[in-house]
C-alpha cells in the first residue's frame, strides 16, 4: 500500500538568519558604525559565508529590505486613502519612508550613494515605483500614465533622500519629509481644502 508523504514545512532557519542580519544592520546603523559584511556577520552572530548564502552583497540586502518597506508603505497609503485626506495620507507615508532611511542610514548611504554601481539604485527605484503604482492608478489625472507617474514620484523621492543620506550636514528628518511633501505633485496630495504644510 503506497504511503503518502507528509509535506515538509519550510525550513525556518533562513528566515531567522535573514532577520538576524537585518536586525544587525539596524543596530550598526543606530550606533553609527560602518555597515560592512564582516561587521554585519559579527553583529548577527553568523559567518560571512552564511551572509552570502542569504544575500549576494550589501546591495541585495538593501534592495530586499526596501522592497518590503515599500510594500508596507503602499498598503498604508491605500488604506488611508479610504478615510484620510490626501495630505494626511502623504504625511503618514513620507514619515514612514524617511524614518526607514534614517533607521538604516549607513547601509542606504553606502548602497545608494555608491559611485561604482547603479544596479542597486535602479532596483530600489523600480521597487518603489512598482509599489507606488496602485496609488497612481487611483490618483493620476486623466491623460497621465500611472506607470510614468509612479516612476516620477519614485525617482524624485529617491533623489531627495539620496542627497540627504550623502550630506555632510544632514537636515533633520522632519525637514526631509517636508521637502518630499512640497515636491509631490499637487494632484497627489491636495483635495479642495488642503495645501501642503
What are these regions (language model features)?
Residues 109-111, 173:
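Short, hydrophobic secondary-structure boundary micro-motifs
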Residues 28-60:
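Helix-turn-helix
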Residues 16-27, 43, 60-80, 92, ...:
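Alpha-helical structural segments
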Residues 1-34, 39:
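Basic, helix-initiating cap at the start of DNA-binding domains
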